[in-house]
Regions:
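A glycine- and small-residue-enriched flexible loop/hinge signal that marks low-structured segments
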Residues: 1-396
Length: 396
């Protein structure tokens, strides 16, 4: 039709424009790059990739965040985890003279060998200097011609683009010499390494638990998730209780007894703050016909966000509202009999029902079924507590 252009594309952002604070998620995990000393708020997969990079084979964080947004999520905080021996790559710019006086230190935005793909070049135009940054061979930032080292440093540190890749520290306020492109971590510069292993996740238990501290109380309520491991489920529950949040939990891939695994978690203190979901789910990949198996918590967090934004924290994120838009398979086919038995053991099944994949349960892990049978009860209480605390701030 003349004058009409139709464009198709894969969704990479939230599917709802409404954002209730209670709908947000807090994700801990491994990433290609990014800071490790703060939690970063992102509102789309594109924003996530700008700071934390693209998919890496050893991590579940990227596909979990992707699933969250595809299934209705609107915003989440990300806490990146690295190993205990992680190092951050750098480059030092000198005056180009015989003494090689060090003038500016450029440090990658977070540990890891991803920084080896960054190169820095200094160009000269008379008495002015310009610092160019390339990543994977593409020019991503340049300072423009500046008259002093302090001006170069200021330009880098005040740039939203440059800060995704590096920070600058002024050592001596003298102009650096012109130089050919040099890679971060090359030669005598500090190498970058995230210390998480080549093909298996060997990041320490302590690193995951410590990352929970990055989710500050001031960020409000929401759901906390760690897709990389089920081994910190107890700590996720404790965090959720302390910060008026919900812990969305998964079990080990291929577990033969999900009910028994959930029973152990039900015995934990404050289990009314947690819900467990089974089985793992499949999502599509960039390769046509190839799917990837991931923990179900990104899917659940997305449907929780959708329910909160459409209705409120009292709305169960199960049944019709949880019909999958992106998830396309389940690890185990849960029939009605198995689903009912799992529900009796505080496990929320994800099932193929009415030609769609849906969450088939809204149980919390609490054995106090008179007061906390459903996870939405604690979700509602959390919202009331947060609003009450906010209202009383002016009276304190």
């Amino acid at each position: 039709m003349p004058g009409v252009t139709i464009t198709t594309a894969v969704r990479t952002g939230p599917t709802s424009a409404t954002v209730r604070e209670s709908s947000q998620a807090f994700f801990i995990g491994l990433a290609q790059r990014g800071p490790v000393d703060e939690a970063v708020l992102v509102r789309s997969l594109a924003e996530f990739e700008e700071t934390f990079g693209t998919y890496v084979t050893y991590a579940y964080l990227h596909p979990t965040v992707q699933t969250f947004f595809e299934e209705g999520g609107t915003q989440c905080y990300i806490a990146r985890v690295v190993g205990p021996g992680a190092t951050t790559a750098n480059v030092i710019l000198d005056d180009g003279g015989p003494s090689a006086d060090e003038l500016i230190e450029l440090t990658a935005n977070g540990p890891g060998n991803w920084a080896h793909s960054m190169q820095i070049q200094v160009t000269a135009s008379g008495s002015l200097r310009n610092i160019k940054l390339t990543y994977n061979g593409d020019l991503v930032y340049q300072t423009g011609n500046r008259a002093s080292a302090s001006a170069l440093v200021s330009a880098i540190n005040n740039s939203a683009i440059a800060s995704q890749y590096m920070t600058a520290t002024l050592l001596i306020d003298e102009l650096p010499g012109a130089s050919a492109a040099v890679a971060f971590g090359a030669g005598t510069y500090t190498d970058g390494n995230d210390d998480i292993g080549d093909s298996t996740v060997d990041t320490t238990f302590t690193a995951y638990v410590s990352a929970l501290d990055l989710f500050l109380d001031s960020y409000g309520t929401g759901a906390v998730v760690c897709p990389e491991t089920h081994q910190i489920n107890t700590q996720l529950i404790a965090h959720a209780n302390s910060y008026n949040r919900i812990a969305l939990l998964h079990l080990e891939e291929g577990t033969s007894d999900p009910a028994d695994d959930a029973a152990t978690l039900s015995a934990e203190d404050h289990s009314e703050h947690a819900a467990v979901y089974y089985p793992w789910v499949f999502i599509p990949t960039d390769v046509n016909g190839v799917n990837k198996l991931i923990p179900p918590t990104g899917f659940v967090a997305g449907k929780r966000a959708l329910a909160h934004n459409q209705t409120g924290p009292h709305q169960p994120y199960a049944g019709l509202v949880s019909s999958a838009r992106f998830v396309n398979g389940v690890e185990v086919d849960v029939n009605r009999t198995l689903g009912d038995s799992l529900d009796a053991e505080y496990v929320n099944a994800i099932r193929f029902i009415a030609n769609s994949i849906r969450i088939y349960g809204a149980r919390s892990l609490s054995t106090d079924t008179d007061n906390f049978r459903f996870i939405t009860i604690q979700d509602t209480v959390n919202g009331v507590v947060i609003e009450a605390n906010a209202s009383m701030e002016d009276l304190v």
